[in-house]
């Protein structure tokens, strides 16, 4: 299951800002923390109203839960078409948190990633007016979207103790303390392997 990373959290925090006392936003909606509103009641379990205060830890907890439970699924709806890498996923969840959906951005999954990246910049208006903050945010999201994500590490399948014991006898792991150090560093049970080595030597 794909998840957001700290890159997404940091991006959202940077542009949303954090206010620990409830306030009304530009359109009169009660808001608190990193842009949390009463539409997030399933997460907060509280009604946001005048005079409400929360801690920074609560603000961060609510943000992370909102991103993972509410907005990540909206981005993953299109994962079959796009197979988002980590950076693309993080950028789009941030976008979705601000805009509410990526359906229009992706033309319901019909646009290429290249076109999606170019279209991100167009969402810098509110009420038909261009906002500098939204322009900066869209540029940051597009930059993250286009950044090459680190390749996913595939787990290395460990060899059996019997196979390693035979390699030890063949001299592949050195001898004495050096062998012990190498085996432990590779995550093998030195004592168990040595026991098998001793048995093989007696045959």
Model-identified regions with their sequence ranges:
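Long, amphipathic alpha-helical surface segments
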Residues: 1-21, 27, 36-39, 58-65, ...
